[in-house]
Amino acid sequence: GKNFFCYNNRLNSKDFIEEVIIPNLRSDVEIIYLDGKEIVSDYPPKYISVALYRLHNYHKFPHLLAIRNDQVVDMSVNNVFYTILDQNQPLDRLFNQMNSFFNNK
């Protein structure tokens, strides 16, 4: 399966995600960036937009996406991400939650 970390251009988190989160993601996690309505990814935008359209919490970024057995599974990490960011907490909880999601086959 494929693993994706999706984030958007929200000003109060974009730099933190790009400078702190993305460099520490597992090597098997690919990035999808939403710059407004434009999808920036190594995959064709049409393919990604179909997957994003099916997200349960589409506006709750950052978001995790996994493709398992041709099924799209997703989870928002918005709450834990912003709690950590706003309260300057260690990132362990966020990475543990993300790794648990990606490990779930």
Q: What are the roles of these predicted feature ranges?
A:
Residues K37-P44, Y58, V72-V73:
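A short acidic, often aromatic-flanked loop/helix-cap motif at beta-alpha or helix-coil junctions
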Residues L34-E38, H63-L64, F95-Q97:
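Short C-terminal domain-edge/linker segments immediately following a structured domain
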Residues E19-R26, A51, M98-K105:
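Hydrophobic, Leu/Ile/Phe/Ala-enriched alpha-helical segments that form helix-helix packing faces
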